[in-house]
């Protein structure tokens, strides 16, 4: 608009059509039950986002005032047929709508050459409307199953404000902040023959302090220390009480009684010459949201999210960036060691699941010429404790090649993910009354091509800060 004021508009969307055929084998040794179930599913997803933002530079150098508003719409419709060649064959139709509105205002004001003040407010509104219906075959045709499906409507409003002050002089940087949040939630469940119709309303206030300290011992050696308290809210789909049927022996559903988890996080880091970093970290979480596995009716596993009483994570992360064995080859290496310790109570028994896990990552970048480049990455996760479950090791290898054309205005990329189809999930579950082993062999390999065209040469548009802060979009798992 002028030399100090910039206004922007963004529009995005994606549309997908997906079909999936799957086979599932279940064996329950104690009661001598075994069977195969075949699932045929089809899903259509339409997502839309619209946003506008304005940034105004104040006359005082370093001062800035910004405001933004974003709207997101997520729509999903799907149908599924589960055939076990027995009378328990089931057909389901599901539909979901999510509307998200987010607005925020932020201000940055330098108090002096060494002191800076930041403040802001944010509000968000979320509305979810999900319906599901199931039918079973009979001599007279398909008839509704009144024990499954219904309608679930969920409304959420979050209002937040924050204040942060920063100090920077010579080799020392200090920042401290405080965020206040108020959350209002209301949900309605239509009920069915197995569950009564119900509703719930929740209101709560919480404070979240943060503090960070950074000190440069010399120009090459930097030390960092930080503390922050965080909130993790349930994904919207995890609150949905509908039951998803894998087969007659495995059901999964949401939990309307889920509440947020709160964590205290401490990190101590050391950086050498901007290319080598090592971090010691510690996190303690109350009411961690994890999947639980329960026996139902002596013949079925019911999977649902629940709050575990405690979760403690400690570990060390080492990262080396931009290593260059030869002129055209750059390597980024990451090694992480994590110790997870979960605790909860089930059927009057105190349960524990704790384990050390190694994680490794390697990213290779090759610049063969000014227009040809390639990437090769590999990631390995070791055996890991995850709530009530133990997850087996997994490996993924990705590769891509890129060509720039037409004076670098056009870029064509050919990529492949999980080249060797090794990133599958294998899980062991043990809890009172339940011992289960899950082996999911989804084919996650992807071969794709991407094309981009830059219409005008100039400075790259920086990603708006607000996009990174819209946490509500990460909670949509319809």
Where do the model's predicted regions map?
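Face-selective signature of the C-terminal outer-membrane beta-barrel domain
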Residues: 2-16, 41-190, 216, 220, ...
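Outer-membrane beta-barrel signature, preferentially recognizing the C-terminal barrel domain
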Residues: 150-157, 202, 231-280, 284, ...
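Outer membrane beta-barrel strand-and-loop segments of large Gram-negative receptors
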Residues: 100-104, 146-149, 255, 259, ...
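Surface-exposed extracellular loop regions of Gram-negative outer-membrane beta-barrel proteins
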Residues: 75-77, 129, 141, 184-189, ...
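Conserved C-terminal beta-signal and adjacent last beta-strands/turns
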Residues: 355-478
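Outer-membrane beta-barrel and related beta-rich outer-membrane complex signature
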Residues: 8-27, 66, 77-83, 129-137, ...
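Residues that define the transmembrane beta-barrel architecture of outer-membrane proteins
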Residues: 44-48, 97-101, 155-159, 203-207, ...
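Extracellular loop and loop/strand-boundary signature of outer-membrane beta-barrel proteins
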Residues: 32-40, 87-93, 143-151, 193-200, ...
